[in-house]
Amino acid sequence: MTRIAFDFALTSYCQSRCKTCPRTNNETGEPEDWLVIRHVPFSKWKKNTIGLSDNIELEYIKFCGQTGDPMMHPDITEFVNHAFTFCNNIMISTNGGLRNTDWYTEMGNKYGEELKIVFAIDGIDHETNWKYREGVDFNKAWNNMVAYCNSPGYTQWDFLVFDWNWKQIPEVARLAKEINVDEVIYKINTGPHGLLDPAKKSIVEEMICQANTI
């Protein structure tokens, strides 16, 4: 039987102004004029997913998208709950600075490791994270990630490596182990904003290799 994964973009709303995100105008920091800011209605999505798992094996369902953070959707809980009626492996990708610790704790307790939440946090402090994820409350994002780590849910920390934060890689690895993050993914930024000096790339790659052994 064919194994298929789906990535649903639920919203084009986002509180962040990431400079190389396709939704952000690099000059103004505001959403691009062409972007229609809207949420996908839950009722419409629910109707459109009827029979989705017929004759196929769903590997996973991911709520991410290109122009918005799924946690901005007011009905995100309903989307997750319904997705679990036809798939047992759900993933949410978020900047972490939305909702509160109670929400993450409750969802982790309810679904355990079958619900993976990917936290895109690019620093170990507010100042560093803000350099790319402008608009995200770092303390809130961090507390939400810690709360999810303390639940039975599966936590992934995505750390995008820029020219200004690569020296934090060892501390990221240490903190991730301290708070019981299940998995850390280090991704070297390829966009123009904060592009890593090519001369440092081999050093950074070695640091990542070392971090993955911690």
Regions found by a protein language model. Give the residues of each.
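N-terminal pre-triad scaffold of radical SAM enzymes
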Residues: 1-24, 59-65
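Radical SAM enzyme [4Fe-4S]-AdoMet core and its adjacent flexible, acidic
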Residues: 9, 24-43, 53-55, 60, ...
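Conserved SAM-binding loop
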Residues: 10, 70, 92
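Glycine-centered loop/turn positions within well-structured domains
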Residues: 16, 90, 126-127
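A short acidic, amphipathic alpha-helical/loop segment
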Residues: 48, 75-82, 102-107, 171-172
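Short glycine-centered, acidic/aromatic-flanked micro-motifs in structured strand/loop junctions
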Residues: 65-66, 94, 159
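Acidic-and-aromatic substrate-binding clefts and catalytic sites of carbohydrate-active enzymes
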Residues: 68-74, 97-102, 162-167, 192-196
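A short glycine-rich beta-strand->turn/loop micro-motif centered on a GG-aromatic cluster
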Residues: 91-96, 185-187
